[in-house]
Amino acid sequence: MLGLQIFTLLSIPTLLYTYELELLDLTRTPPEKELEYWCTYANHCRFCWDCQDGICRNKVFENHSPILENDYIANCSVFRRNEFCTYYVTSIKPHEVYRTECPQQSHEWHEAVIRKWQKLLTYGFYLVGCVLVANYVRKRSLQTVMYLLVLLVIFFLLSQLMLYRELEDKKHKIGSIPPKRELEHWCTHGKYCDFCWDCQNGICRNKVFKNHPPIGENDFIRHDCWTIHLSNKCYYQKIYKYPDYHMMECSQPTPYKWYDNLMKKQDIM
């Protein structure tokens, strides 16, 4: 009985910690429970329709009128990685790529509790530890020690969860314009992205590196760059004629060397 109680108490914070969206590998048939989400964004994908004898009926939205099977209904592949969801229209070449906002799992109910009792959890962690040691030294009661040990583990896991959620809040979600404090990082790697440049009347000046000479607005500056900042990796996607993904380490951005090297070469010449 004591073992079952310990297991139950330990499982609660563990479940909270792992309450995240599952990954979804690239597939043409997403899970049925997710069809409503995908068919809201990609209502022209074939997995949203049941087509028989040239007549197609929507699988999710029954009030949708039947339509004739035609080029509107396309073959699609979908996948999900943490904070972003993507679907490809595979019947078009080159493939068209679309990004959508993944449905967010709500952590608000336990985040509010954790934030409210943050100091209490910290003090409680030390208090239970002290009582645990004192009780073991004085009475050496195994049952009491086990209960206190369970409480100590719960306080520890809750504190880790609190720290984890704080780090989650600092992540930069998918977007076309990264935070200003991160511009130096992104413009080191994706120096041709439009958010790195201030363009007026066909003349573009770099927002981050003031020593960079003005350049004329041209195809070098991609006007569609998307950035994703996960816990330990950063991605940016440049969309110009066809999508192109780049990955880098967030914690160790490459120093801005390309312009310095160029200026040194010019000085030598």
Curated annotation (Swiss-Prot):
The B repeat ranges on this chain: 147-269
Entry-linked Pfam families: v110 (PF01639)
Location in or out of the cell: Host membrane
Signal peptide interval: 1-26
Superkingdom classification of source: Viruses
Extracellular side: 27-116, 166-269
Residues annotated as transmembrane: 117-137, 145-165
The protein's role, per its UniProt record: Plays a role in virus cell tropism, and may be required for efficient virus replication in macrophages.
Name the record gives this protein: Protein MGF 110-1L
